[in-house]
């Protein structure tokens, strides 16, 4: 496991080497894997990871269903709420459905509407790894939404490299380092041989050069 001080040093370098900008940049992390056969589905990583401090960006969430879940969704301030009729309508509006699928990071759906979702929205959500998390009747979705607001989705498919946003330049190095640590711990727990299967890790700001993290 990488020491926190090593991560903080790499983050400081990434910020120092980045050209000064008049906007808040994202801080991105890239992980390159090795010694793993990604043609085998069982080796692929598909994880939702909670970042202790969030990544500093708005995470858009859509809730699909009716009744109590809609009330909770409104109270939670989710970006999109869709009932059964709207789900079915989107089945005949592929362009709009694709836009919704690309703009929202997470989807929650009442179990009662999952069959509708699969039929009408599955072709748009499935390939993006955004099929909804089923929510049984009576479940309080507010803590789920709160958790997802601070989460990132990693889906490698058959790729040996993947990148994700772990913070912004407005956040402290300590906060971003703790986010990176959470990602590394989860990824290593999914690799059969742990850090032996990690080739390299890089950190960069949106417009800055990549800085290698010493493993």
From Swiss-Prot:
Keywords: Repressor, Ribonucleoprotein, Ribosomal protein, RNA-binding, rRNA-binding, Translation regulation, tRNA-binding. One of its GO terms (molecular function) is structural constituent of ribosome. Disulfide bonds: none annotated. It holds the Pfam family Ribosomal_L1. One of its GO terms (biological process) is regulation of translation. GO terms for cellular component: large ribosomal subunit. SUPFAM superfamilies: Ribosomal protein L1. InterPro entries: Ribosomal_uL1, Ribosomal_uL1-like, Ribosomal_uL1/biogenesis, Ribosomal_uL1_3-a/b-sand, Ribosomal_uL1_arc, Ribosomal_uL1_CS. Belongs to the universal ribosomal protein uL1 family. Binds directly to 23S rRNA. Probably involved in E site tRNA release. PANTHER family: 54S RIBOSOMAL PROTEIN L1, MITOCHONDRIAL, LARGE RIBOSOMAL SUBUNIT PROTEIN UL1M. Part of the 50S ribosomal subunit. This is Large ribosomal subunit protein uL1. It comes from Methanospirillum hungatei JF-1 (strain ATCC 27890 / DSM 864 / NBRC 100397 / JF-1). The gene is rpl1.
């Amino acid at each position: 496991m990488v020491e926190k001080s090593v991560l903080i040093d790499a983050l400081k370098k990434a910020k120092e080497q980045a050209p000064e900008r008049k906007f808040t940049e994202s801080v991105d992390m890239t992980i390159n894997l090795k010694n793993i056969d990604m043609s085998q589905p069982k080796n692929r990583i598909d994880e939702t990871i909670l970042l202790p401090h969030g990544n500093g960006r708005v995470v858009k969430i859509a809730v699909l269903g009716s009744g109590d879940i809609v009330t909770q969704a409104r109270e939670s301030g989710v970006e999109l709420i869709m009932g059964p009729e709207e789900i079915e309508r989107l089945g005949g509006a592929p362009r709009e459905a694709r836009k919704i699928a690309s703009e929202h990071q997470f989807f929650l759906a009442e179990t009662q509407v999952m069959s509708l979702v699969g039929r009408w929205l599955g072709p748009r959500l499935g390939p993006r790894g955004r099929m909804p998390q089923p929510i049984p009747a009576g479940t309080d979705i507010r803590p789920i939404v709160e958790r997802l607001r601070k989460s990132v989705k990693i889906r490698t498919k058959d790729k040996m490299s993947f990148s994700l946003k772990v913070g912004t330049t407005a956040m402290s190095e300590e906060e971003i380092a703790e986010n990176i640590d959470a990602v590394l711990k989860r990824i290593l727990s999914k690799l059969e041989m742990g850090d032996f299967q990690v080739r390299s890790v890089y950190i960069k700001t949106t417009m800055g050069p990549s800085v290698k993290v010493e493993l």
